[in-house]
Every structure is written in C-alpha cells, then in structure tokens.
Amino acid sequence: MTDSRTRRGTLVRRGGICRGLRNVLGMTTGRHAALGALALVLGTSLLAGCADFDESTASPFTPEPTNQASAEVQPENPPPSTTPPAPRTGPLGPCQDADTAVIATCLDTTGGLVTLPDGNSGLVAERRTGRIMQVAPNTTPVEVAKIDVDGSGDGGLLDIALSPTFVEDNLIYAYVTTGTDNRVVRIAPGDTAKEVLGGIPRGASGNGGSLEFAAPDQLMVLTGDTGNPAVAQDPGSLAGKLLRVRSLTPNAAPPRPEVVLSGIGNGGGVCVDPGIATWVTDRTTLEDRLQRVGSDGTVTSPAWTWPDRPGVGGCIAVQGVVAVALGAGKAISALAADPGTGAITTAPSAVAKDTYGQLGGLALGSDGLMWASTINKTAGEPGPNDDKVVKIPMPSGSGGID
C-alpha cells in the first residue's frame, strides 16, 4: 500500500517576546502557509496581553523545509478557522461522533501522530497494538503497517516519523518497545520492521520516547529514563537522552549516536523549529518540563516547567511558538519564546481545555490546524468512541494554563 504524508521538532523583558511574535505574524505567506497559519493564530492569541514595544529590527525568516511526499500539486491552503464546525445531525451509528472536528474514532490508545499533505488525512500509531492507521474524516481507519511491540506499562509503538525520501521509499521510522529493549525501526507498508538502532534500555515504566527529523540525515530520538533518573545522567547509557542518529539504515553494528542532551525523565515529545531550535518535553517526579537546544547547541534547561505535572506529550514548533499536548491537563499548551534567547516569560495559553480528555500526539495539518490524538483508554476516562484523532480549532483569545 502506498501512502504519502508530511512531517509533521535566561529571563528577558516581555517586550522581546512580543516583538518576536509580531515578527512571526508578518511571515504567513509563501509555500509554507501551513506553518505560517499556525504561528499566526497561536501568536495572535499569545499577543493579546502584550504592550506596544518598539518593533524595529526583525529577525530574518527561515521557512521550514517540507517533505514532498506527494507528486500531485497540493491546492493552496485557506487560513485556519477559529469557528468550530457545525455538529452533525441525524442518527449516529457506532463509532460516529456528532463533533465534526473528530477525524477518527474507536482507536486503541494512541502513540505518535502525523498528517498527510492532502490536509484531510493522517497516520496515527496505536501504542499497544503496534498498528499504524491511516485516518480521515467520515472514513473507517485503515491499517497501513503493523510492528510487533510490547505494549505493557507505558511501552509499545510510541512514535512515528516519515523518511525524508518517503515519496520514493515509503519508509516510516518508529520508536518501539520490545520484550528486551526500546529501539528505532523502520518499516514500509506490507513489510516487516527492520532495526535501525537497538539496545536502548527499557523498564517497567519510563519508556516514553519520540522521533523527529532535524535534517534528511539526522533523526532526533528522545528516550525515557526507564523510571531510573540515574541512568539519564550515565554517559554509557542511551536511556534518558536526546540522541542524534545519522545511520538511518539497518546495520548489524550501527555507530553510537551523538548524545545531544542528558537528564531526560520520561520522554514526551521532540519537535524541531528549523534553523532555530529543537524542543523537548519530558516528565519527572518533581515537574514536567520544556527544554530547548538552540541551533548553536546552547541548552536552555528548562525553558518552562509545570509543577502540577499535567503530562506533557507531543509538540509542534513554528518560528518560536511551541504547542504541547497535555495528558492530565486535558488541553494543548501554547507558549511563545523570545526569538533571540529562547526564553519563555509569559504563561502559556490553553487550547481545547477539557474538550477531548487526555491528549498525547500532536501534529500540524497542511491547512495550519493542529491535529491531536487522545489517550483516554489508558490514561483518562474513555467515552464510547475513544480513542480519537481530532482537529483542534485555534484560539481567538488568550487564557492561562501554568
């Protein structure tokens, strides 16, 4: 079966944040309209409380590279709507939802999520079953591939990422838990998974991890600490780290990956803001964190913390605006970073608070809207149609969740 998709990565005065957001808001045209649209709407929300600081000297705009995963020319995308779609009317059958923002229902608890370039479909991982499902509105989810995983505890099929040359090779990279370790594998539809990087320690808990391509030859791999914070500080262990993997083909003796960041708790998500920073979310016994690795390697740790531990998960980063899925927090948290320092000094705004339950995966659609996957079957209070993939309406105002 052939599919295509896109990928889905010090305190300063508040004026720097506001100027940076205004710079982003002026960068919403061109072939990367989806990224600009996300930054536009999130940025507008976060700007609501900004004072009128001097707006001179904007940083140059570097557009995010995209994978050309479809040979067809995609239509120009309209700006995202802030108005929820009208509810469906008439009798509903099994696994049908009255909310038209719901894209797919009756999934097993989810792992990673990505969107396809048509803007109307995506791929979502089922964490416990190891299935990769193609989902679209008003369409029954279809299994694209399946990987043997150990879905006990918090392990299983944890995240997926598209090969940079997917249009030619149809390869999907995945971060998975097996009976002996956590590992990175790759798989094509209808094929079996091949190991790319193995030997990452696994545990009864703390197996959370994530994948994101920073460049065609660089796969960022976030690994959990297996419930043992000491291994996250151990340079000899691959657990509790952000790794840069350059060997992307199956190899009996792959080279050891570069350790970019140590001290990770239970991995949440990794997202790349091209040319600016790589962002990492993780969960510790004391707090949940958002950490930043600048393009020059400078680490801001943490860039933001949540002492109430809302369960940070997948993330999206666009021109200094970061969106983070929250599990126990039952929302998406949107944060704005100063474009020069990466500092976050303004409390996040909350999106879709208490609307769909616990959220885990997060992706960007080609129309600029966020897609999220729920994890209610294992972490929340599941309804009859859980778990789901939903398209989240963007905020028109601001609210706080800290």
What are these regions (language model features)?
Residues 1-54:
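Secretory targeting and sorting signals
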Residues 2, 32, 43, 51-227, ...:
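Acidic, Gly/Ser/Thr-rich repeat motifs that build Ca2+-stabilized beta-propeller blades
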Residues 91-98, 233-235, 287-288, 296-302:
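Glycine-rich phosphate-binding "P-loop"
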Residues 165-167, 249, 285:
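Acidic glycine-/aspartate-rich tracts in secreted/extracellular proteins
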Residues 227-278:
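Loop-centered beta-sheet repeat module
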Residues 242, 291, 296-305, 388-402:
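Predominantly five- to eight-bladed beta-propeller fold
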Residues 246-249, 295-296, 336-343:
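Short helix-loop-beta junction
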Residues 271, 279-281, 285-327:
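Flexible, glycine-rich surface segments
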